[in-house]
């Protein structure tokens, strides 16, 4: 059975996340023992799961990197960088919000920043790998659902990119008007919808390719 492109990146991203989660959960347990508590066996299981995902992901990730190179060399290859750009924007805006103390943040992100670079760097790599891996995986799903010759094969990719844009767009709303959280959700929802539609319309206007997704033979 052929492993869909993007699986390696997903495994690497999830593996890093699990490996990073162990120390963070332990740190939370020390700070808030009444709210968060996990036994040593549980922490060990999380670490083993993360290492297993990481090893398996690194073993098959060359296929994903080759796929990315092929996608980036398309005339519209820039569009496949969007998941990475959204991750960078989300993290950057989150750090700005954290420095200003404007809103409640994801406790794992806040804790990773407070612990230091050793936690932030793996978190960023994990976030990027998960985002880009899922986007590539959605290209395969779209081809499987709709076939290689129809523009609708790009719909799952467009939807994933739209969903990923909710974070940075809602963060913009929180930075502009910190006291009105409803505005951030509204801005994120509207932007997410427009982002998905815009990406899908881009692909609909593109001329057909012999092998549009570079994801194996079209037959």
Predicted regions and their residues:
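Hydrophobic alpha-helical segments at protein termini of multi-pass membrane proteins
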Residues: 1-219
